A protein has these predicted regions:
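Register position in tetratricopeptide repeats
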Residues: 526, 560, 593-594, 628, ...
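Alpha-helical transmembrane segments of multi-pass inner-membrane proteins
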Residues: 2-37, 51-61, 85-95, 106-120, ...
């Protein structure tokens, strides 16, 4: 019997280290279960949690630096670590040229925090026995909980017969359904790994059920990025199984593991197809088909537009970009013609291109290089002399890495702590296995790093400001609940004497890029402190110079101060930065006061292509106020508006004013009111006289003709009523069916039943309620 030469005290110490290291890794992986805790966005407390765990882990590693010195030394012998460090330095340098340097700090707290967590995780993993199985079990446990949090509401929706596809109820523990879907896909390879390790049938069946239910949830969530990642994982897994099959001499038993993924996939898709029969739920194949519909799918078309302008920006700014985290501001310049309200494209929906727009081509190449090195490491591991059971694990890491890369190419996982945590874990494991492979190939010998404690010291020094920034950001996102909530509701109920303390100074823009200072300035404006508000609004312009929000508020203050030139200057500035309806309306009102029809026509010609009804209405109001009655161009615009927005009756009123003039329209309305009053008194002849007079003044208003005909009909003068109904039916038809119905009754009274029945049928076509009864009574 072999003797254990490890001293008891050393063995106990190692066990303690294993337990602590495992506990820290588990703590890291629990990041996805941190709730929003009152913040606008769940990511704020999650980033704070990540840095807090890193502080504790770094302190533990520092305290035991001698124990971990070889792990630290190994890490800094890799090209990956130095490339990662270079990327961090380059990103940090963007503070000095960024549009908004404060936003760089906010994002550095996340990017650098992730890199420090990577260092901690790598070091902690080195000494843990059975690390692959431990990580797989924890990740699978997280997968089980996340899947259940999606499955439970999903089954409830299906039971109710409701439309479950893309339902926001399926977001699970995350902020939205897309994050939930990719979080499930990236963790699923760990469950598949355990399924391959399982020795007992019931264990394999349990993992199979978990994977099946996970894929079922994914199908109903219907996130296209998750579909791509899922299918890519399936392809990689099958390829890996076939590689083992041919490498081992084609033993049939090695084909069985293919079923571990294929069967759950087929079963899950099949069940989802059956569950959607007779409902409006999108099927897997229907949703998959939209992935390539770039011209008909707005979401895909929008992404392609983002990618093109992103590449354009990189080519125009090859060395330095907008600054880390600043694409959300720069995007306004490129996408302003497509922005509605203040909803800007915060993310590129492609982390790789977005990094290029923010950090230039050097930053893009460094970030892309990280993935290139990881792929190269995977290939090296596969060709190494490592034991097959160790190389076996890297195949599943490759699946998770591919999921992250798909997510990074179609979404923005760099902003999601739940995805960053799995990514850094996969990175750490791949680098660790690469070093093990080099050691087996005798290309690397682990050696302790002298003064290894300095690595932890540097991490802790960096974590102090980083944690402070994430804390400030978390507090800000709590306060933004107040600012954004009251802004969206148009309220000012929060006390002015507390408004400056509602959010800290970091960040200086909201999650929607509205400048915090400008949002606070609204309260000072409401309380008449205009000079204080102007000071804050100028700070708001510095924070976000492209949104136009601050400039619009400044224009309103200068209008109140009767400083017309300044008001117009800032109104135009806001409109040119972001030509949205509120900016258009504010600028237009000032142009009306100045009588500047040429500028009014210019901005309308620019904005009319958006087909926003408020833009058309505001322009027509301005045109009617400044241009002569019957102006040919004004009438042409009115006709175009009615054709574009046939259901909006406001445009008919505006057209009448353009054609007839407001005074005539108002006079006709007043006379019609007199006629309606006489009709109510059953003085039908005098009512008809007044109503016909109104119709003569305003021949564009169908109701005047219709009511005149109704008055003559009620007076028993059926023949006299017919021309008025004909005017409505043939020229002004509102498609209500009322004129057709009353004219039909008039014709019945005149003995023309056949023609009357045709009119009743027309009225029924327009869903006029009394038409059915008339048809039954007179047309059978």
């Amino acid at each position: 019997m072999a003797k254990n030469n490890t001293p008891p005290n050393q063995s106990n110490s190692q066990t303690v280290h294993h337990l602590y290291s495992s506990a820290f890794l588990i703590a890291y992986l629990l990041i996805g279960f941190v709730p929003n805790l009152g913040a606008v966005d769940q990511i704020a407390p999650q980033w704070l949690y990540l840095n807090a765990v890193s502080v504790l882990a770094a302190l533990y590693i520092l305290k035991n630096h001698a124990y971990f010195s070889s792990a630290v030394g190994s890490l800094f012998k890799t090209k990956f670590s130095w490339l990662y460090a270079a990327f961090i330095v380059w990103a940090s340098a963007s503070y000095f040229y960024a549009i908004n340097p404060t936003e760089v700090l906010v994002n550095l707290a996340r990017v650098v925090g992730t890199s420090i967590a990577f260092v901690n995780v790598f070091v902690l993993l080195q000494k843990i026995p059975n690390k692959f199985k431990l990580i797989a079990m924890v990740a699978t446990g997280a997968l089980l909980v996340e899947m259940y949090m999606v499955l439970d509401p999903l089954l409830g929706l299906l039971k109710q017969g409701a439309n479950a596809s893309r339902s926001s109820l399926l977001k699970g523990t995350t902020g939205n359904i897309n994050i939930a879907a990719l979080s499930l896909v990236i963790k699923m390879p760990f469950a598949l790994y355990l399924m391959n390790l399982a020795q007992k049938t019931w264990q394999r069946m349990a993992y199979g059920v978990l994977i099946t239910l996970t894929i079922f949830c994914l199908v109903l969530i219907a996130s296209r990025a998750s579909y791509v990642a899922l299918v890519l994982s399936l392809i990689l897994y099958v390829a890996f199984c076939l590689y083992n099959y041919f490498k081992a001499g084609k033993p049939k038993r090695l084909l069985i593991p293919i079923l571990y993924f294929v069967v759950p996939f087929v079963v899950a898709v099949g069940i989802s197809e059956l569950s959607t029969i007779g409902k409006n739920n999108t099927t897997f194949f229907e949703r998959s088909a939209t992935i390539v519909q770039a011209t008909t799918d707005g979401s895909i078309a929008g992404r392609l537009r983002f990618y093109m302008v992103g590449v354009e920006h990189i080519l125009n700014n090859p060395v330095v970009g907008a600054g880390l985290g600043n694409w959300k501001l720069m995007s306004i310049l490129y996408d302003k013609e497509f922005i509605n309200g203040y909803v800007v494209p915060y993310h590129m929906h492609n982390d790789f291109i977005q990094i290029g727009t923010e950090l230039g081509i050097p930053g893009f190449l460094m970030y892309l290089g990280l993935f290139g090195l990881l792929i190269a490491y995977i290939v090296y591991i596969a060709k190494s002399k490592l034991p097959e059971n160790t190389k076996f694990f890297v195949a599943f890491l490759a699946m998770s890495l591919s999921t992250y890369m798909v997510d990074g190419a179609l979404n923005f996982p760099i902003a999601r702590p739940i995805m960053q945590m799995v990514w850094l874990l996969v990175m750490a494991l791949i680098v660790l296995l690469f070093l093990d492979a080099k050691a087996f190939n005798k290309d690397h010998k682990p050696t302790p790093l002298k003064n290894a404690y300095w690595v932890s010291v540097v991490c802790l020094v960096l974590l102090a400001p980083l944690t402070y920034i994430t804390y400030q950001t978390n507090e800000s996102l709590k306060g933004q609940q107040v600012l954004l909530g009251e802004y969206n509701a148009g309220k000012f109920t929060y006390p002015l004497n507390k408004i400056d303390q509602v959010v800290p100074g970091i960040p200086n823009i909201s999650v929607t890029t509205l400048p915090i200072a400008s949002m606070k300035a609204r309260y000072y404006m409401e309380n008449g402190q205009d000079d204080k508000a102007l000071e804050m609004l100028r700070a708001g312009i510095t924070a976000n110079p492209y949104l136009g929000f601050s400039e619009t508020l400044m224009s309103q203050i200068f209008t109140k101060k009767n400083q017309r030139d300044s008001a117009t200057y800032y109104a135009k500035d806001a409109y040119e930065h972001l030509p949205i309806p509120p900016h258009f309306a504010n600028y237009l009102n000032l142009l009306i006061q100045e009588g500047d029809t040429a500028e009014i026509d210019r901005i309308f010609a620019k904005d009319s292509v958006k087909h926003d009804p408020m833009v058309w209405k505001n322009y027509m109001i301005a045109s009617n106020a400044l241009k002569p009655t019957g102006d040919t161009a004004a009438v042409a615009v009115a006709n175009s508006a009615i054709a574009l927005f046939p259901a909006d009756k406001d445009f008919l009123v505006l057209k009448k004013i353009a054609v007839l003039g407001k005074e005539t329209v108002d006079r006709a309305f007043a006379i019609s009111q007199e006629g309606s009053a006489l009709f109510q008194q059953q003085d039908f002849m005098n009512a008809a006289q007044k109503l016909s007079e109104a119709a003569a003044l305003d021949p564009l208003e169908f109701s005047y003709f219709e009511n005149t005909g109704a008055a003559y009909f009620s007076a028993g003068l059926y023949e006299l009523s017919l021309p008025y109904f004909d005017k409505v039916i043939q020229e002004l038809n509102p498609k209500s069916g009322k004129s057709e119905y009353i004219k039909g009754l008039a014709l019945i009274n005149l003995g023309r039943n056949e023609a009357a029945c045709e009119l009743f049928k027309a009225a029924k076509k327009y869903r006029y309620a009394a038409a059915d009864q008339a048809l039954q009574t007179h047309c059978n």
